[in-house]
Design a protein with these regions (language model features):
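Ribonuclease/tRNase effector modules and their secretory precursors
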Residues: 1-119
Length: 119
């Protein structure tokens, strides 16, 4: 059935818990993801790193394919003020593998701003 995967994914997102405790020591980039993020969304590596390292909100979405490597979303803001939504895999030893990034929707910006006030 078309769209059923999206509904299940939306349920996972709704039930995901915020996590402000992740410590990122290293960011892993793969060329095809860098190219896609820039071509499709106009977001640079520097902007993703800025948003990811500037006190973002994290949400664990689910288990990864490898034990101990889970899928996360990040809601962050660059120093220039751009709101960026980032998808990454939490790897071993405080490293993250960036999968995708895009501008936040208006709803995501509201969510981010509301939850940043609480932290």
């Amino acid at each position: 059935m078309i769209g059923s995967g999206r509904k299940q994914f939306s349920e996972k997102l709704k039930n995901a818990k915020l996590d402000a405790t992740l410590r990122i020591e290293r960011i892993i980039w793969i060329g095809k993801f860098v190219q896609k993020i820039y071509q499709k969304h106009g977001i640079t590596v520097e902007e993703v790193e800025d948003a990811l390292l500037s006190n973002p909100l994290f949400r664990r979405i689910g288990r990864g394919h490898v034990k101990g490597e889970d899928l996360y979303f990040s809601y962050g803001r660059t120093n220039a003020g751009r709101y960026i939504f980032i998808v990454f895999v939490w790897k071993h030893e405080d490293a993250v593998l960036i999968i995708s990034a895009r501008d936040m929707t208006a709803r995501e910006r509201r969510y981010y701003n509301e939850h940043k006030k609480k932290i």
